[in-house]
Amino acid sequence: MAMKIARVEPGSEAEVLGLGPGDELLSVDENELNDSLDYDFYTDSKSFHLKARVADGIREWDVQRTERGPFGCDFQTYLGDQKHSCSNHCMFCFIDQLPPGMRESLYFKDDDERLSFLFGNYITMTNMQDHEIDRIIKMHISPINISVHTTNPQLRVRMLANKRGGEVLKYLPRLVEGGIAVNCQLVLCRGINDGDELRRTLSDLLELTPMVQSIAAVPCGVTDYREKPFKQTPYDAKTSAEVIDIMEEFGDECKRRHGKRIIYPSDEWYLKAGRPIPPEEFYEDFDQLENGVGMMRLYASEFLAELEKPHRIYGTKKMDVVTGEMASPLIHQMMAELHRQYPMVEVTVHTIKNKFFGGNVGVAGLVTATDIIAQCEGKLTSGTLGVPAVMLREEKDTFLDDITTDQLAQRLGVKVEVLPTSGGDEARALLRSGLHIARRRRA
């Protein structure tokens, strides 16, 4: 394998050696470089032997350094080889429920421990072998995010449809004993891995604390494109409340024993159960934001805190914004409070029902431009439509259905403004403009 250089830091030791864009690093101390983690680990030394492919052939250097630290290379990609693809056929897999005709990259299922560390992806470990666990421990690649779902080996085999699903659970204690911090995800399927099975899973994982540093439970998503024979019944208010009660019971016990809760239901459970989102202190360090744990509480706290500050407002401002069904009540509440404190700013909220995926998916991050167009055309009250950044892919201008923000703007005949994810940043964006200092209206 080889790591192709995209950029060399000016003045770095890599530049002194004459390395530049297009050159390929092959090995350090005869250790092959498969990814940026190998590079970081093996070059973090005062001396090493480097082998590279440059314009005139293979060159080698004995590098002597005064101190450890970054060597100075940035690469075209974090991985020198291919992403490790998923070998499971999980009964709850959302990618298997995507509609046909979407971009090819969306159908790729990765299960790569390197992306877990680099980007926070969750892995099941079913395609990992002992030497890869040894590498994680040796390089102290920590934390690792693991999709556990259940600690019952037989049930995990069934849920992942992979005969190694139960066997690889042995890697959890090995990682923990090796000093690797672990964040755990539980995708719960009604009547399958909740109830007593959830209690068993939480009990087993608590035995691995404090290196298991967080455990989040999220409900299985169900779309109209499920082709697998696994029947999934969506959670209702009663069954969602049962999950919350179990998670909070174990979280309370963990807090008594270890001083930290670490066990969190995602926001969706509270919304389904009709219960209020817990206060900010419940979420401690917000370790599981990417799983939708505490996201609404943090958003509201930041949004309201920003409204406490004076802002410059240029005259009056009208704007439309879109959101998903799950966040809709909170967004309506925040926009009403914004208007109460700053009457010159009026925001109309449009709740988008996710018909693209079949109506059972309520999160804002899965709203498509197709649904926005169908449900907002002719109904907008202003010349600007605010779109949450979470609805867009990594390119930051394209929805899941491959429609760009420019295309959306052209279709609706308005300017499209991408709104930041954090509550504070969004409040500032909505208030941006002004000829004078607008003092918020007090109660």
Regions found by a protein language model. Name each.
Residues 2-10, 30-33:
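Short, structured beta-strand/loop micro-motifs enriched in basic residues and often containing a Trp
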Residues 4, 274-443:
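Radical SAM enzyme core and accessory elements
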Residues 143-145, 181-183, 214-216, 262-264, ...:
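Structural preference for beta-strand elements that scaffold enzyme active sites
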